[in-house]
């Protein structure tokens, strides 16, 4: 019977705050939905990719160079290497497209056949699924590469191309202009790559003793693998940021609502104590509804994670090639979400009751004496303000808890909205910043074999204005591989602080932070000590740069050769024609820019989802707290109405308080948005790409405008509420 009475009382109190509790439930639901969805997605994605790498025997190390059968035998003698396989990878230009031909490997980096069969002769090939799907290529179609016609006999997927990356500058290539085709083993006369696998770690120092090579690329240093690891970190970052903010704000609203309810019902609580009701029972009466709210809201959020995760799978499958992604429940994150929501609601509700639980029944039942402040002579500034303005200031200072929570909620909404738009701006600005401040090339030409520096392969003409040579190698720092580009000290196509190239290494800021070095410090690169001479604010085309003269002081055996050309042209179409005549492989600046456009097209839906959640957060907080303020100030508004204040003047008072909150929350939100963007930039950076926070002025204006519009709905709610007030109802709440 007692339990039944307590339950009835709890339901009645829930009914009294139904609108606010509905808003809090929405915040908790979204927090649980975000948390459960992103962590479930991360776990499923990690499991699927790990299984794919294991099943298709993803190579632990890829060696690049010119290899013979004798080189393979040398490696077979090593007890640490379990599997070795030769193959050839070569890029060709075919019109506006880049075609990468790869000889099939049967032991390592095995492809997955989706349709057809594998090639058996040199006249056949299989195409990677991303390109075939985008260009609507079917079995038995003809695929032309370098003037040779190949019959398409199959469509495949590859563990190397889960992310459709072409190079360090094109890590999200356009399937319309970049094709990957696999050919038979005997298609190429020689091999330029060796794939290695081992049950233990393969050390580069050991391989160096066995045979010469151009580059040693461990699995963790491949672009495909780095992007996979980067996405895992990004999921975790988003899974913590958004849910934490939503949970904390909902718990704060619970604290404020229950605190106010207890002040209103202090006589009832005193009566319950006098009748022998224990503190535990009183806690149950007032906190049960909030605990149930947290439990059921988070449970609904967990249930909704299924369709939302499926939606993310579809979005992500447009960015990566992993059709095996399928939803399954991970009970750990469901339990964590339910526990955080339920305990958080219970703990914050309990904290709001601590003061009144300590009181004796007589004190609780006593009439509350309003706090009277010492009368002060108003300053000249305050006297010059209107009554409405002074009332708005006084009301804000009198209700510090609600005022602070309103400002905090609007700041959080502003910060998350600016963060979402700024994330989009930062990615968009990478390529523009790179070509505006650093790179001035129109083409990058990759030579199949290094040439002596005094040998020119392209003649300067009306189509080719300027060309500058460079040697692109791999540099190992702290057991990680990085692009090492050696060029002349007077290079102008790249803005490299030429006076610093002869003094040491010029590195991007991202590398400097990662290695914990600054100008003048030394690092060990390829087992040689080198000095950092300059640090550049680069986001794209990340590499270690130095001059031939300085490199020869570090690496005595360095040959005077080049394998890369940076080319400028006033007539790009004529330049393309000249490069094609020379049968040279090249990439254009426009193709590098297209990489980021493709990435943004794929991420557009995710950005929209983040923006929607930010708007929901702001609208919910404003609705809940505004409704609470209106309920509490019923008598004040009734008194103002009786004293002759029109509804328009009362709304002006509310509007001025709203403007004061906006003036505080929007700048705080801007600071929070910038801080969030700076905090997560490391998770969105890799050895080939570093995100630099960059927010456009338009994003600031749009964010402030959206938050102001959301806040203006407060006036509509207030107008409707004040219209419904009656004198009798106002007298009922006079005591409060």
Annotate the PLM regions:
Residues 1-33, 261, 287, 291, ...:
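N-terminal Sec/SRP start-transfer signal
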Residues 255-259, 265-267, 291-323, 331-358, ...:
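Small-residue-rich transmembrane alpha-helices
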Residues 15-25, 30-58, 309-315, 319, ...:
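Alpha-helical transmembrane segments
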Residues 41, 45-49, 99-105, 203-249, ...:
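Peri-transmembrane interface segments
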Residues 38-39, 79, 85-120, 151-159, ...:
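The feature marks short, hydrophobic/small-residue-biased sequence motifs that occur predominantly
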Residues 17, 252-291, 620-660:
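Interfacial "coupling" helices/loops that link adjacent transmembrane helices in transporter permeases
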Residues 62-63, 387-514, 518-521, 527, ...:
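Juxtamembrane segments of multi-pass membrane proteins
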Residues 113-183, 499-550:
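Hydrophobic secondary-structure segments that place a key small or acidic residue at a functional site
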């Amino acid at each position: 019977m007692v339990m039944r009475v307590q339950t009835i009382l709890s339901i009645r109190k829930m009914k009294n705050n139904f609108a606010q509790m509905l808003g809090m439930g929405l915040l908790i639901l979204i927090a649980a939905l975000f948390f459960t969805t992103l962590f479930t997605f991360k776990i499923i994605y990690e499991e699927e990719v790990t299984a794919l790498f294991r099943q298709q025997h993803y190579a632990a190390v890829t060696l690049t160079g010119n290899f013979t059968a004798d080189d393979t035998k040398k490696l077979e003698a090593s007890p640490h290497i379990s599997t070795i396989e030769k193959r050839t990878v070569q890029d060709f230009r075919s019109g506006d497209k880049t075609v990468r031909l790869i000889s099939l490997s049967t032991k390592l980096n095995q492809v997955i056949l989706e349709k057809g069969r594998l090639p058996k002769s040199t006249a056949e090939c299989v195409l990677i699924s991303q390109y075939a799907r985008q260009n609507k290529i079917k079995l038995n179609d003809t695929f032309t590469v370098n003037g040779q016609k190949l019959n398409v006999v199959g469509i495949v997927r590859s563990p190397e191309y889960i992310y459709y990356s072409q190079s360090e500058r094109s890590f999200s290539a356009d399937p319309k202009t970049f094709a990957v085709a696999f050919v038979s083993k005997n298609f190429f006369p020689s091999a330029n790559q060796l794939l290695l696998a081992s049950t233990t770690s393969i050390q580069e120092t050991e391989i160096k003793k066995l045979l010469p090579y151009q580059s040693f690329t461990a699995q963790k240093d491949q672009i495909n693998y780095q992007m996979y690891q980067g996405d895992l970190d990004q999921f975790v970052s988003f899974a913590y940021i958004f849910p934490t903010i939503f949970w904390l704000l909902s718990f704060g609203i619970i604290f404020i609502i229950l605190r106010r309810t207890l002040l209103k019902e202090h006589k009832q609580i005193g009566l319950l104590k006098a009748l022998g009701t224990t503190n535990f029972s009183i806690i149950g009466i007032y906190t049960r509804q909030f605990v149930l709210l947290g439990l059921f809201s988070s449970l609904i959020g967990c249930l909704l994670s299924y369709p939302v995760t499926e939606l993310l799978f579809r979005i992500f499958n447009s960015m990566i090639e992993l059709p095996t992604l399928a939803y399954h429940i991970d009970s750990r994150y469901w339990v964590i979400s339910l526990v955080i929501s339920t305990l958080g609601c219970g703990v914050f509700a309990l904290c709001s009751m601590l003061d009144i639980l300590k009181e004796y029944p007589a004190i609780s039942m006593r009439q509350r004496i309003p706090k009277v402040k010492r009368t002060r002579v108003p300053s000249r500034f305050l006297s010059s303000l209107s009554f409405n303005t002074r009332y708005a200031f006084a009301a804000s200072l009198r209700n510090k808890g609600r005022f602070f929570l309103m400002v905090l909620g609007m700041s959080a909404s502003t910060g998350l909205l600016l963060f979402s738009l700024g994330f989009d701006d930062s990615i968009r600005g990478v390529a523009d910043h790179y070509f505006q401040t650093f790179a001035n090339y129109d083409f990058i030409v990759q030579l199949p074999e290094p040439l002596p520096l005094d040998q020119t392969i392209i003649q300067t003409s009306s189509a080719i204005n300027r060309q500058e040579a460079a040697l692109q190698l791999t540099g190992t720092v702290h057991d990680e591989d990085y692009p090492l580009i050696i060029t002349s000290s007077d290079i102008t196509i790249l803005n490299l602080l030429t006076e610093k190239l002869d003094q040491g290494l010029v590195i991007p800021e991202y590398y400097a932070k990662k290695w914990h070095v600054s100008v003048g410090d030394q690092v060990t690169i390829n087992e040689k000590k080198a000095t950092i001479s300059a640090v550049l604010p680069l986001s794209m085309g990340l590499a270690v740069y130095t001059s031939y003269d300085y490199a020869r002081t570090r690496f005595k055996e360095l040959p005077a050769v080049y394998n890369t050309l940076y080319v400028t042209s006033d007539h790009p179409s004529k330049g393309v024609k000249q490069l094609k005549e020379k049968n040279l492989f090249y990439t254009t600046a426009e193709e590098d820019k297209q990489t980021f456009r493709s990435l943004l097209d794929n991420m557009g839906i995710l950005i929209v989802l983040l923006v929607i959640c930010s708007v929901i957060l702001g609208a919910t907080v404003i609705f809940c707290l505004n409704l609470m303020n209106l309920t509490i100030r019923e008598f004040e508004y009734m008194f103002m109405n009786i004293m002759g204040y029109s509804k328009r003047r009362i709304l002006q008072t509310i509007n001025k308080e709203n403007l004061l909150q906006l003036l505080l929350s929007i700048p705080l939100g801007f600071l929070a948005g910038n801080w969030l963007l700076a905090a997560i930039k490391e998770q969105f950076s890799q050895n080939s790409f570093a995100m630099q926070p960059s927010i456009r002025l338009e994003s600031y204006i749009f964010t402030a405008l959206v938050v102001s519009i959301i806040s203006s709905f407060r006036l509509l709610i207030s107008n409707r509420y004040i219209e419904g007030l009656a004198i009798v109802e106002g007298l009922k709440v006079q005591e409060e």
